[in-house]
Amino acid sequence: MNAEKSPVNHNVDHEEIAKFEAVASRWWDLEGEFKPLHRINPLRLGYIAERAGGLFGKKVLDVGCGGGILAESMAREGATVTGLDMGFEPLQVAKLHALESGIQVDYVQETVEEHAAKHAGQYDVVTCMEMLEHVPDPQSVVRACAQLVKPGGDVFFSTLNRNGKSWLMAVVGAEYILRMVPKGTHDVKKFIKPAELLGWVDQTSLKERHITGLHYNPITNTFKLGPGVDVNYMLHTQNK
């Protein structure tokens, strides 16, 4: 279980990094700022495992892993997991939590572009969850993810659609009314329409396999996957 440091690449928004550095110590607080991530993680994990045909014995890269919620859960499924993030504090939290949990995950402080330059074609599965909307050049991340996966391997993206409903739900609702996440977590201008993401995917060796929405019901306080990608959505692609 390593936590390596790396030079900063151009595709980093230091203000975004600072946001997550400031709350890193509470990453594994099930009732804290990251409660929504803990709540949706079983849905994400189930979707990834099902679409990828299981994770046991596979080499997996989690891009933008933060404090390691998804990375740890994939390791528990029997995957060999590497977690990438540019936030030093979140990686320290992830490393300590994995140690306490007896879970083996390699954590590296490095951009996905830097990692792709050294590890092209080495992963069976690459995940990039809620990360694209936090970098200056999300298309560059998509290209790097495509370079990192083996032929026939699976790449998963999740992000937020850019429209009025998404702004109301993810910013006004989640940040200011329900206070599910800290204020300022999201910038609607950085949200990504599915057509934009699919356009970037089409310029790589990846091919779209499936897309699904992630929906929150404030009345029942529950999340579920289903049709409709107008707010949160996940995309499964495969290397041709």
UniProtKB/Swiss-Prot annotation:
- Give the highest taxon in the source lineage: Bacteria
Q: Which GO terms describe its molecular function?
A: 2-methoxy-6-polyprenyl-1,4-benzoquinol methyltransferase activity; 2-polyprenyl-6-hydroxyphenol methylase activity; 3-demethylubiquinol 3-O-methyltransferase activity; methyltransferase activity; phosphatidylglycerol binding; polyprenyldihydroxybenzoate methyltransferase activity
* Reaction it catalyzes: a 3-demethylubiquinol + S-adenosyl-L-methionine = a ubiquinol + S-adenosyl-L-homocysteine + H(+); a 3-(all-trans-polyprenyl)benzene-1,2-diol + S-adenosyl-L-methionine = a 2-methoxy-6-(all-trans-polyprenyl)phenol + S-adenosyl-L-homocysteine + H(+)
Copy the pathway line from the protein's UniProt record.
Cofactor biosynthesis; ubiquinone biosynthesis
According to its record, what are the GO cellular component terms? Answer: cytoplasmic side of plasma membrane; cytosol; ubiquinone biosynthesis complex
Instruction: Cite the SUPFAM superfamilies for this sequence.
Output: S-adenosyl-L-methionine-dependent methyltransferases (SSF53335)
What does the record give as EC number? 2.1.1.222, 2.1.1.64
Per the annotation, which location comes first and is thus the protein's main one?
A: cytoplasm
Which compartments does it reside in? Cytoplasm
Cytoplasm among keywords: yes
- Keywords, sorted A to Z: Cytoplasm, Methyltransferase, S-adenosyl-L-methionine, Transferase, Ubiquinone biosynthesis
A GO term (biological process) for this protein? Answer: hyperosmotic salinity response
Q: Which residues bind S-adenosyl-L-methionine?
A: R44, G64, D85, M129
Q: Does the keyword Signal apply?
A: no
* Subunit and partners: Homodimer. Component of the Ubi complex metabolon, which regroups five ubiquinone biosynthesis proteins (UbiE, UbiF, UbiG, UbiH and UbiI) and two accessory factors (UbiK and the lipid-binding protein UbiJ).
> PANTHER family, per this entry?
METHYLTRANSFERASE, UBIQUINONE BIOSYNTHESIS O-METHYLTRANSFERASE, MITOCHONDRIAL
The function of this protein is: O-methyltransferase that catalyzes the 2 O-methylation steps in the ubiquinone biosynthetic pathway.
- Give the UniProt family note: Belongs to the methyltransferase superfamily. UbiG/COQ3 family.
Protein name in the entry? Ubiquinone biosynthesis O-methyltransferase
UniProt organism field: Escherichia coli (strain K12)
